[in-house]
């Protein structure tokens, strides 16, 4: 295996680390969370509608924010603008940080942004379809990218509907 002779041992703040016990190895698997960017994408040339996308692997009517991974040497701001361009072909004209949100289930840290974007929407091969949703139709969910939606709504003084427990993806009246 990639990590031979490893076992979990107590370490910092009660977290477990997996050191290698091979003589002289010294390797420790830290299992740090992976940073992921997410975009609350406001289409400024479509009356401020919010773009939600559905991945081919997801059930019908399951839509979420555009998300993606950082590339080596890339800032999170550049990454979220690139992901919006790659996934839906929109040009980011403004990128503003909303916050960072833990997503323990996937061991990720979601870095949420409000991205104002414009252009002709064209989906890449990852996505099956998209919806443009009026901001008041959004319904935040209790984890990760849903918290970015909540914070975006609160920053605009919007009434935020009660968060639906157990819903891991965006919910909108669409």
Question: Where are each of the predicted segments found?
Answer:
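Conserved Nudix-box catalytic region and its N-terminal flanking loop in Nudix hydrolases
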Residues: 32-33, 43-86
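Conserved hydrophobic/aromatic beta-strand scaffold that supports enzyme active sites
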Residues: 17-19, 40, 52, 112-114, ...
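Short loop segments at secondary-structure junctions
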Residues: 43-47, 56, 116-120, 135-137
């Amino acid at each position: 295996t990639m990590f031979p002779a490893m076992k979990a041992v107590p370490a910092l703040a009660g977290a477990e680390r997996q050191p290698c016990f091979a003589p002289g190895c010294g390797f420790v698997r830290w299992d740090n969370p992976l940073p992921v960017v997410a975009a609350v994408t406001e289409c400024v040339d479509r009356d401020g509608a919010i773009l939600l996308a559905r991945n081919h692997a997801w059930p019908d009517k399951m839509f979420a924010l555009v998300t993606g991974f950082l590339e080596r040497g890339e800032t999170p701001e550049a990454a979220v603008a690139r992901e919006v361009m790659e996934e839906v072909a929109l040009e980011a004209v403004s990128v503003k940080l909303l916050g960072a949100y833990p997503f323990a289930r996937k061991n990720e840290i979601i870095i949420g942004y409000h991205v104002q974007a414009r252009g002709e929407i064209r989906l890449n091969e990852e996505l099956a379809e998209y919806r443009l949703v009026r901001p008041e139709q959004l319904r935040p969910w209790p984890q990760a990218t849903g918290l970015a939606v909540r914070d975006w709504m609160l920053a605009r003084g919007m009434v935020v509907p009660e968060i639906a427990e157990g819903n891991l993806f965006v919910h909108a009246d669409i």
